C-alpha cells in the first residue's frame, strides 16, 4: 500500500523542521514546501529569506525528503498586505498573520499541495484538529503557553479536514529536545517573532514607507491639547511607548496611553493611567465573522474569548441578535483592557476554538457625551 503523501510548510525554523521529521518517522511520504511571501526587501538587512531557504534545504537533506520553493508574493500582496494597509489607513490595527493563515498558508499553499498529489498538508503551528461526529474541530495545543489557535480561527471545515498539526500534542520544550537529538542544523535557531514581512525593523519606519504622515492634535480625554501626533495610522489603542509625552508633567503623573482616535477631526486621544475608563470595555461588536463549524454559537452562549494573542480566555456571553447584519456582540463578565478595532475576537468553548470576527467597536467607560465620537472612529472603514 502506498504511503499517504503530506506536504509540510517549511520555514527554516525549528518547529516546521521537527514537524517534517515527526511525519517522516510516522511513515508518511513527506515533501517540504518553502513559501516565499515577500519580495520587497530581498536585499535588506531585515530579510532572512535566503538563510531560511538554506536552512530548509539542509534539514531536508538530513531527514531525507524532497523540498521545493514556491513564490506566493503576488497572492500575499493582493490578499494580505493590501488589506493590512487599508486597515491602518482607516485608523485600525489589523492582524495580518490571521489573514495570512486563511488566505495563503491554508488556501494558496493547500491548493498547491493538492496539485502535487498530496492528501494532506502540515505546518508547525501549535494547535490540534479533532474529528467529532463528522465535523472537524480546531483545538488549543496541549501546551497552552504556545497555543496558536487564535491565529487559525478563520480555518474552515474543508481546510481542517486536510490539515495536520503534529506539534499540538507535544510541549515546546520537547520540540527543542528532538531538534537537538536528531542534530538538526537549525536546532539552536531562535523562534521568529512579530509580523513576518516586517521582521526586526522599526515598525513605524516600515509603515511610513507605504502610508504618509498626517499630523494632527493630541488631546487628553478632557479635550486639552497636549501635543501633536504624526498620523493616526501610526498609533494603536493602549499604546504607551512612542507617544512623545514621557516627560509631560500634566495630570496625575501616571504614564500616558493612546485612548482613542477620532477620524473626522484627525484627533488622537490620550489618557493617564493603565486602568483609565477610556481603556476598559465590557462590550464589543465584531464583524467579518468566520466560524469553524460553519455557523455561529447560539444567542446567549457563555464562552471564553481572546481579543489579543497570549491573553487568557475572558468569560463572556455571545449575542448576534440586534448586533446588526453579519455582526456579533460579546458582553464580558469583567472589563477588558484596550480592546482594539481591527484585531480579532476569538471565541472558545474550553479548548475548542469556535471562530470569531474582526473587532469593529468597543464600548468603553468614557462619558456618554463622548460615545458617539468614539463610535464613529472605531467603526470607520
From Swiss-Prot:
It catalyses: S-sulfanyl-L-cysteinyl-[protein] + uridine(34) in tRNA + AH2 + ATP = 2-thiouridine(34) in tRNA + L-cysteinyl-[protein] + A + AMP + diphosphate + H(+). GO terms for molecular function: ATP binding; tRNA binding; tRNA-uridine 2-sulfurtransferase activity. The record marks 125, 343 as: Interaction with tRNA. One of its GO terms (cellular component) is cytoplasm. ATP binds at residues 9-16, 35, 124. Disulfide bonds join 100-196. It is an enzyme of class 2 (transferase). It is found in: Cytoplasm. Catalyzes the 2-thiolation of uridine at the wobble position (U34) of tRNA, leading to the formation of s(2)U34. This is tRNA-specific 2-thiouridylase MnmA. It comes from Paraburkholderia xenovorans (strain LB400).
Amino acid at each position: 500500500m502506498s504511503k499517504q503523501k503530506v506536504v509540510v510548510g517549511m520555514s527554516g525554523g525549528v518547529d516546521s523542521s521537527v514537524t517534517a521529521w515527526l511525519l517522516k518517522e510516522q511513515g508518511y511520504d513527506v515533501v517540504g514546501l518553502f513559501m516565499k511571501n515577500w519580495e520587497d526587501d530581498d536585499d535588506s538587512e531585515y530579510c532572512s529569506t535566503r538563510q531560511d531557504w538554506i536552512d530548509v534545504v539542509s534539514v531536508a537533506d538530513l531527514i531525507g525528503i524532497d523540498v521545493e520553493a514556491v513564490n506566493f508574493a503576488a497572492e500575499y500582496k493582493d490578499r494580505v498586505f493590501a488589506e493590512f494597509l487599508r486597515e491602518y489607513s482607516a485608523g485600525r490595527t489589523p492582524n495580518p498573520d490571521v489573514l495570512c493563515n486563511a488566505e495563503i498558508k491554508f488556501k494558496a499553499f493547500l491548493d498547491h499541495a493538492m496539485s502535487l498529489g498530496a492528501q494532506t498538508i502540515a505546518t508547525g503551528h501549535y494547535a490540534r484538529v479533532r474529528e467529532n461526529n463528522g465535523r472537524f474541530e480546531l483545538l488549543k495545543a496541549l501546551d497552552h503557553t504556545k497555543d496558536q489557535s487564535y491565529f487559525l480561527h478563520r480555518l474552515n471545515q474543508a481546510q481542517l479536514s486536510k490539515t495536520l498539526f503534529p506539534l499540538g500534542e507535544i510541549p515546546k520544550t520537547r520540540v527543542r529536545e528532538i531538534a537537538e537529538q536528531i542534530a538538526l542544523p537549525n536546532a539552536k535557531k531562535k523562534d521568529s517573532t512579530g509580523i513576518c514581512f516586517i521582521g526586526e525593523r522599526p515598525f513605524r519606519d516600515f509603515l511610513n514607507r507605504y502610508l504618509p504622515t498626517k499630523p494632527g492634535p493630541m488631546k487628553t480625554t478632557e479635550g486639552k491639547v497636549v501635543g501633536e501626533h504624526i498620523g493616526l495610522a501610526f498609533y494603536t489603542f493602549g499604546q504607551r511607548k512612542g507617544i512623545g509625552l514621557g516627560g509631560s508633567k500634566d495630570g496625575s503623573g501616571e504614564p500616558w496611553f493612546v485612548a482613542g482616535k477620532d477620524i473626522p477631526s484627525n484627533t488622537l486621544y490620550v489618557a493617564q493611567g493603565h486602568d483609565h475608563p477610556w481603556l476598559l470595555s465590557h462590550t464589543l461588536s465584531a464583524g467579518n465573522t468566520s466560524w469553524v463549524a460553519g455557523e455561529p454559537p447560539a444567542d446567549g452562549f457563555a464562552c471564553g474569548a481572546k481579543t489579543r494573542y497570549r491573553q487568557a480566555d475572558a468569560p463572556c456571553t455571545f449575542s448576534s441578535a440586534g448586533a446588526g447584519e453579519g455582526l456579533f456582540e460579546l458582553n464580558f463578565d469583567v472589563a477588558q483592557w484596550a480592546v482594539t478595532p481591527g484585531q480579532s475576537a476569538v471565541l472558545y468553548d474550553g479548548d475548542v476554538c469556535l471562530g470569531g470576527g474582526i473587532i469593529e467597536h468597543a464600548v468603553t467607560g468614557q462619558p456618554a457625551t463622548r460615545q458617539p465620537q468614539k463610535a464613529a472612529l472605531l467603526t470607520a472603514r
